Amino acid sequence: TLFETGESNGKISLSKILEDENYDIDGILSETELEQLFFAACRGGWPRCMALTKDSAKLEIAKDYYRQIYQKDISAIDGINRNPEWARTLLWSYARNMATTAKRKNIFADVKATQNVTDVTLASYVEALETLFVVRDIDAWTPHLRSKTAIRSAKKHIFIDPSIALAALGIEPNYFINDLDLFGHVFENTVLRDLLVYAEKHNARLLHYTDDTGLEADAVYQMADGRYALIEVKVGVNKIPEAEKSLLRFKEVIRRYNDTALQNEKHPRDVYREPSALIVICANANMAYTTDSGVKIVPIGCLRD
């Protein structure tokens, strides 16, 4: 996680936000610059990096692992000989779709545009990459707040370490200076990876939500006792008001649904717990604060479990 590699000072605990409604984060500062996050994404969280001093050497670690994955590991994991070029192209296509809910058939179409391979074969390659802890899917949260046709149940695709994705794309840290849109996907992938680690540590679940009305949460962090946070992930502070508005709308949808569900006393519908916290995790924020509406703005440079 970014806390373990030093990009986060760890002064804000996600667990405490959920456990203590009086937990005060206001005024906590982050010293992490956007350029540091560019570098961290390309470097990755590989333990081998910790022993190196030169940044250029640190960036080579992820590239080495990337080559090893498609040249050797994808076959060695279960003893099945797999085509390195198919594996390389699949990693490239997955990287182009990181932190999205792109359909697998579309990801596979990228590969099949240049490689003579079937969907069944590519699916077995994905299984191998999952076993190797290279890629992982985040399940969708599917409460009955909307009709079944409105809720999108597609999984969100992420890399366990986004540095592998960036190695597949051939991207260096300075590239993001002129492409913050791409970094938005990379940053979301990075945050989701950290949240997954925190969820596993605290016996929690990490989900996401999207529906056809535009309602969404980049992450739904759900504790074992039912408490949960709705989380939006943004790079720039200029996107915070939009994220705040989206989270508040989500909370209001849950509230209105519950009000309606309770009106019919003889045949009540499910009532959903309201979120314990609404959180915007921001790459470029230098200070944590709580908005007037109660949304927590957390710089990634402060977050820990």
Tell me what each language-model feature is:
Residues 50-227:
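Accessory nucleic acid-recognition modules appended to NTPase machines
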Residues 16-26, 252-277:
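Short mixed-charge
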Residues 20-68:
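Amphipathic alpha-helical "lid/sensor" segments that cap RecA-like P-loop NTPase cores
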Residues 3-7, 167, 240-242, 287-292:
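Switch/connector loops and helix/strand junctions flanking conserved nucleotide-binding motifs
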Residues 227-229, 277:
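Structural motif
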Residues 229-239, 250:
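Active-site ExK catalytic segment of metal-dependent nucleases
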Residues 276-277, 281-305:
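Domain-level recognition of nuclease-like catalytic cores that cleave nucleotide substrates
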Residues 1-19:
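Conserved small helical "lid"/interfacial subdomain of P-loop NTPases
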